[in-house]
């Protein structure tokens, strides 16, 4: 908090002190000859105003904390004025003052150090900043040179840092480090121009630019590293996607092939079952035909025997009917279950007729011998078939 308050106080002091310095810089060039101030006046002005360019016009370039340049085209009058001012400043603050002959070289290439005051007091540090502006008679001074001074009188409070800037667009920034006998760290004052400067002078400016460049480079590298990481993560995805697509493309035809094969197998099984059912019906029908043929052959053979035994005494008409039945029985290819049923129906009809023909049984028993004789005579005409028919009768 103390540092912030001191900074605010210093800024206000700079704003208050700047119009005074402007008045002094504008009033001094009007007098061609300036006498050196006495030591008492310098001592009275030193606590309130910074030593150096505060009481000198814009032509003065020697300041304890600034590095400025003076062109070589100075007149002897100006050098004498500068030397007189230097002697007055040296008498007030006990600073080493260069000789008038070496003032040009010192002002052009060297920077003055902060004087170390011998008096130690408990007063707070006084910090003042003097922005340099271009006046009407500021011909030999380089434009845009800002110098700031800070005088510390050996206090125990932490030192402060004051930064002043000039509104000029050209000129280097001056930064000086002041070593004091206080217990705190050294005080650093830096001044910089608000506008762009053609040449960068001073370590703070170079370090600031280098820090900006390093931060930009670091950000660039971080962005590039992120890009590489994203590309590295995208590569496996691109390599995995074809495998997944290929596996999916392979699975689909496999499933389709399995479905088709299962459908074909089901159709084949159904067709085979139908074939088996059809062949089973044919075999059963064929077996029935064969069995039916045998049964039908046996049936008609028996029916004519019964009819022959029952109708032999009735006359020749019945015998002719028996022959017709025998003739029909000799054709086994035409016999079926239906014909067999007919034969059974005929046998049932004959059985029903037997009880009704009871009185004729005695008459029928007598001609049986004659019927047998006829049956014996018939083999001669019919051949071996008649013998086969005669065998069951004898049995």
Curated annotation (Swiss-Prot):
Q: Which keywords does this Swiss-Prot/TrEMBL entry list?
A: Cell projection, Glycoprotein, Membrane, Nucleus, Phosphoprotein, Signal, Transmembrane, Transmembrane helix, Ubl conjugation
| GO MF assignments | heat shock protein binding; Hsp70 protein binding; transmembrane signaling receptor activity
> What top-level branch of life does the organism fall under?
Eukaryota
One of the GO BP terms on file: negative regulation of T cell proliferation
Per the UniProt entry, the effect of residue 284 to A is:
Significant reduction in interaction with RDX
Q: Provide ranges: composition bias, Low complexity.
A: 73-88, 155-166, 205-241
Q: Which InterPro entries match?
A: Leukosialin
Q: According to the UniProt record, list the residues that bear Phosphoserine.
A: 285, 328, 339, 343, 347, 371
Q: Residue numbers of motif Nuclear localization signal?
A: 276-290
Record's Gene Ontology CC terms?
A: basement membrane; external side of plasma membrane; extracellular space; microvillus; plasma membrane; PML body; uropod
In which residue ranges is the amino acid composition biased (Basic and acidic residues)?
A: 385-395
Q: Which residues cross the membrane?
A: 249-271
Which subcellular locations apply to this protein?
A: Membrane; Cell projection, Microvillus; Cell projection, Uropodium
**What does the UniProt record report as the effect of altering residue 347 to D in this chain?**
No loss of phosphorylation or localization to the uropodium. Loss of interaction with EZR
Task: Point to the regions of Polar residues compositional bias.
Answer: 27-56, 89-111, 145-154, 167-196, 327-338
Q: Which residues lie on this side of the membrane: Cytoplasmic?
A: 272-395
Chain spans, region Required for interaction with EZR, MSN and RDX and for co-localization to microvilli: 272-302
Free-text description of this protein's post-translational modifications in UniProt: Phosphorylation at Ser-347 is regulated by chemokines, requires its association with ERM proteins (EZR, RDX and MSN) and is essential for its function in the regulation of T-cell trafficking to lymph nodes.
Assembly information from the UniProt record: Interacts with SIGLEC1.
The free-text function statement in the UniProt record for this protein reads: Predominant cell surface sialoprotein of leukocytes which regulates multiple T-cell functions, including T-cell activation, proliferation, differentiation, trafficking and migration. Positively regulates T-cell trafficking to lymph-nodes via its association with ERM proteins (EZR, RDX and MSN). Negatively regulates Th2 cell differentiation and predisposes the differentiation of T-cells towards a Th1 lineage commitment.
Write the protein's name.
Leukosialin
| Species name | Mus musculus (Mouse)
């Amino acid at each position: 908090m103390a540092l912030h308050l001191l900074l605010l106080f210093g800024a206000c002091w700079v704003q208050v002190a700047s119009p005074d310095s402007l008045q002094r810089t504008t009033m001094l060039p009007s007098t061609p000859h300036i006498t050196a101030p006495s030591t008492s006046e310098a001592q009275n002005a030193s606590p309130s105003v910074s030593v150096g360019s505060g009481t000198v016009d814009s032509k003065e370039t020697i300041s304890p904390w600034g590095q400025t340049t003076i062109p070589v085209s100075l007149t002897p009058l100006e050098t004498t004025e500068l030397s007189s001012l230097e002697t007055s400043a040296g008498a007030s603050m006990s600073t080493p003052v260069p000789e008038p002959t070496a003032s040009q070289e010192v002002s052009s290439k060297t920077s003055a150090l902060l004087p170390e005051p011998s008096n130690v007091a408990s007063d707070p540090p006084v910090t003042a900043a003097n922005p340099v502006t271009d006046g009407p008679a500021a011909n030999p001074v380089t434009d845009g040179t800002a110098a700031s001074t800070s005088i510390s009188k050996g206090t125990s409070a932490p030192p402060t840092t004051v930064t002043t800037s000039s509104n000029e667009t050209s000129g280097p920034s001056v930064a000086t480090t002041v070593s004091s006998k206080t217990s705190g760290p050294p005080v650093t004052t830096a001044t910089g121009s608000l506008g762009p400067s053609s040449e960068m002078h001073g370590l703070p400016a170079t370090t600031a630019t280098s820090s900006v460049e390093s931060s930009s480079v670091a950000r660039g590298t971080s962005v590039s590293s992120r890009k590489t990481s994203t590309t590295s993560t995208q590569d496996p995805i691109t390599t995995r996607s074809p495998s997944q697509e290929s596996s999916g493309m392979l699975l689909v035809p496999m499933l389709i092939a399995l479905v088709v094969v299962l459908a074909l197998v089901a159709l084949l099984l159904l067709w085979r079952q139908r074939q088996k059912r059809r062949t089973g019906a044919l075999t059963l029908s064929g077996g029935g035909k064969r069995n039916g043929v045998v049964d039908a052959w046996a049936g008609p053979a028996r029916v004519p025997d019964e009819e022959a035994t029952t109708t032999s005494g009735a006359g020749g008409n019945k015998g002719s009917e028996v022959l017709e039945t025998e003739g029909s029985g000799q054709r086994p290819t035409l016999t079926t279950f239906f014909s067999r049923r007919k034969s059974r129906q005929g046998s049932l009809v004959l059985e029903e007729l037997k009880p009704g023909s009871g009185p004729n049984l005695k008459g029928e028993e007598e001609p049986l011998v004659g019927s047998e004789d006829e049956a014996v005579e018939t083999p001669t005409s019919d051949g071996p078939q008649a013998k086969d028919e005669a065998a069951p009768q004898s049995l």
